[in-house]
């Protein structure tokens, strides 16, 4: 078997799964599989685009006040009152629960456990198991199947940036120290007690967020380690020209644990 071709296909499959799991696209696609939901929206004159967006946002947020949802859906209508009117229609259609005493909307539709786990693993770009493509313009990222921006956030421009540096750091071979992942416990700061002014509910949310991140990170690391004995991280600039590696679960610019589990594939003793 040609190992290089196998790794290439593995990398393409990882990228295809990532593209499929772009957050809003994937969540909306789950709702679009249910014909009953479309029938309800049509019956109550709820535009499908708005309805699916609304359901996806509610599934992700679980509960939210109307102001928050209006802000998230503002691209559908120029008039904020129109968005409120459509949300009221969704309440009448029983697509969401409204608790008048708390003034909050609560989702009626939970994502399945399998879908949620796949989203957790693949909604962010993963490390590459083959060398990244050479980037030749600001719209490339090094990934085989998808472009993007080499300038982070909403700061894209066509001006010259140092592509040579990006290509150089993109091709550094890295590996995971799986013994460290098992023997050293990952932790975030201030999870042992509530912050000043923090509610018990918010404290619990922070702990739950860490548990979810940590569990998913270990699964992603196992996936990458099984695919190849080395991996590559892609990089981009911020608007001030500082270099950041792309990676949510695996990132050598993270906390102490994130740094400790990543090593150079080709090591040498520093004199």
Where are these regions (language model features)?
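Non-catalytic nucleic-acid-binding interfaces of large nucleic-acid enzymes and RNP effectors
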Residues: 1-271
């Amino acid at each position: 078997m040609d190992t290089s071709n196998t790794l290439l296909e593995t990398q393409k499959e990882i990228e295809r799964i990532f593209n499929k799991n772009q957050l809003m696209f994937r969540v909306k696609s789950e709702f679009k599989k249910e014909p009953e939901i479309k029938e309800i929206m049509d019956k109550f004159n709820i535009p499908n685009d708005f309805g699916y967006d609304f359901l996806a946002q509610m599934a992700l947020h679980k509960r939210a006040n109307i102001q928050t949802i209006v802000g998230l859906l503002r691209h559908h209508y120029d008039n904020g009152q129109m968005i409120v009117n459509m949300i009221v229609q969704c309440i009448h259609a029983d697509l969401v629960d409204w608790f008048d005493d708390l003034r909050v909307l609560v989702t009626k539709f939970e994502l399945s456990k399998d879908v949620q786990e796949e989203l957790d693993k693949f909604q962010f770009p993963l490390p590459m198991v083959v060398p990244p493509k050479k980037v030749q313009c600001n719209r490339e990222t090094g990934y085989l199947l998808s472009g993007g921006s080499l300038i982070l956030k909403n700061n894209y421009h066509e001006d010259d940036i140092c592509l040579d540096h990006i290509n150089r750091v993109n091709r550094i071979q890295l590996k995971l120290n799986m013994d460290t992942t098992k023997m050293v416990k990952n932790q975030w700061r201030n999870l042992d007690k509530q912050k000043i002014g923090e509610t018990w509910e918010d404290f619990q949310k922070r702990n739950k967020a860490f548990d979810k991140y940590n569990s998913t990170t270990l699964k992603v690391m196992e996936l990458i380690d099984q695919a190849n004995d080395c991996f590559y991280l892609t990089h981009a600039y911020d608007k001030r020209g500082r270099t950041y590696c792309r990676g949510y679960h695996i990132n050598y610019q993270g906390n102490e644990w994130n740094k400790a589990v990543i090593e150079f594939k080709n090591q040498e003793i520093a004199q």
